[in-house]
């Protein structure tokens, strides 16, 4: 299968996707009513898109192409408002978080959609288990070679993005001991983790052609890499973040990725090499398991650094770019988060430690998303 030509995009423009949980009070399990909610909301949209994801308990909010995080925030806020209004009318709740803490995958209904039904046929129960919720951020690129460079540059900071956004400590009714358990769900997929090494767009086109020989890959959407190029949109898409509990945190994460992309493409601080990925999965695991307390290891020097410390260094490096893009408020908020030493997974554990239940936790998440 031939790959689409890389669509030229305005560099550093943004697109944000948020996979939301559709909740059924008063038990606060996942609902199977996303189709009802989507049908009610679509006629009211003035910008962005609300659509299905894999199962009927998932709802995706997606912005259009945005100049900056303020425009993205305005679109997401408008969508949030109409979704919450429709959810209230249908006696449903909406919340963030990377996993639902006690849902059972066996109960999840795959959407009546040709692509998702084909994926169910290919992957079986793995698709139902993938009822997890992430934030994806697209950044515009001028050409395919820039996209490949940006993908490799952003891959250095996958642990940082995971640790900052980690919001999935519970799964199937248990504390997993992970800050981000969501990404473990994808470990059985054949395309899990980093993209196979290529050095330019021409090599990527060849890689895609060979992957399509498997008959399991019909489009870029069928590849579940942590970061992937999207030629139809002219973007690089970062896919490792848990869906945050608040819209503010989602915007902050998008601002960080936009600023990091600007820094990488203007400063070119790395010369990408295949060896960069030697310890990729080890460092990724540290972020998933321990969050900001994880320790990452340099593949070349063997130096070991706390993720919290290295994240502060990243935030300092991208601050000038953030100012140029109007994303400095996002960097300031994330810097404060790191200095306080927490993420949303830590908050969830503290809620339970203080005597809360998993049902009460989901109820609280719905209240947080609704601004209560």
Swiss-Prot record:
The keyword ATP-binding applies. Pfam families: GCS2. One of its GO terms (molecular function) is ATP binding. InterPro entries: GCL_type2/YbdK_subfam (IPR050141), GCS2 (IPR006336), Gln_synth/guanido_kin_cat_dom (IPR014746), YbdK (IPR011793). It catalyses: L-cysteine + L-glutamate + ATP = gamma-L-glutamyl-L-cysteine + ADP + phosphate + H(+). Keywords: ATP-binding, Ligase, Nucleotide-binding. Signal peptide: none annotated. Its EC number is 6.3.2.2. One of its GO terms (biological process) is modified amino acid biosynthetic process. It is an enzyme of class 6 (ligase). Gene3D superfamilies: 3.30.590.20. Homodimer. ATP-dependent carboxylate-amine ligase which exhibits weak glutamate--cysteine ligase activity. PANTHER family: GLUTAMATE--CYSTEINE LIGASE 2-RELATED. Belongs to the glutamate--cysteine ligase type 2 family. YbdK subfamily. This is Putative glutamate--cysteine ligase 2.
